């Protein structure tokens, strides 16, 4: 494979091919990469027929099954061998693509990524990382749902992987890594957090700044926030819900009378910039860090812009060879990881 090739689950998400196909094609056109659109051939080709394809490298790979949102990931993995999410993962495993993007069943994406694409040697638990807006620059929050029960050395490895991601994808030379807890002071938190803190403190090749609290997530004072998947998913969904609710309240108040409407008109450019900063579609999806190849798991409600951003993120991950940095970090801290495991036994 010469050019970057990204396999896209065309059947994933609430809107399926109608948004996945144009989003993936836009990324291929602007980025000069190739996309493999995996799904029901007839439905995918119907969407392609609506889009100019001059100079765009697109190939349709048929998959006869779709992972249902109400199905268990284990059932999808065992029984739906021709589900689009399984097919995209096999394309990567067999060397036909460099990475995948899916807005479908997130649990199935994680399971298929782990068991078909495989983990980076030394990584025990791949983690979902979410890029989130703050007052200053975006941060990486992980894990946001792949692992609800974790051990201290898992959190430590999450931080190592996110460090490489933040450097390559967000451009932070020395990412500041914080551990999410109930207080900033060393010694605050539950047993998991306190023991993970000790591992981070002993690491020599990362910029660990200590504990951070929930209120610090959006200040931009750190670049990476590490937590287990239960806490991370709650934090992510809480921020999404708060953002949506506040946007509705703001819109209602701004349209409540003549003067608010006039002020809104005068500040329109500022509101547009704000909307762009908090728009999840700008960030695409959550990378599943720790796999042999990159997998981007998108929100089920993703629009074409979000799919395009996710494909671009996957391509950047591949082109910057971020997985090599992940492997190096895991290997360099292998002894410390073993120490963390031994302490827990």
Curated annotation (Swiss-Prot):
Homodimer. Probably interacts with PlsY. Its main location: cytoplasm. GO terms for biological process: fatty acid biosynthetic process; phospholipid biosynthetic process. The keyword Transferase applies. Pathway: Lipid metabolism; phospholipid metabolism. It is found in: Cytoplasm. Its EC number is 2.3.1.274. It catalyses: a fatty acyl-[ACP] + phosphate = an acyl phosphate + holo-[ACP]. Gene3D superfamilies: Isopropylmalate Dehydrogenase. The gene is plsX. HAMAP family: PlsX (MF_00019). Keywords: Cytoplasm, Lipid biosynthesis, Lipid metabolism, Phospholipid biosynthesis, Phospholipid metabolism, Transferase. Transmembrane segments: none annotated. Catalyzes the reversible formation of acyl-phosphate (acyl-PO(4)) from acyl-[acyl-carrier-protein] (acyl-ACP). This enzyme utilizes acyl-ACP as fatty acyl donor, but not acyl-CoA. This is Phosphate acyltransferase. Belongs to the PlsX family. One of its GO terms (cellular component) is cytoplasm. GO terms for molecular function: phosphate:acyl-[acyl carrier protein] acyltransferase activity. It comes from the Bacteria. It is an enzyme of class 2 (transferase).
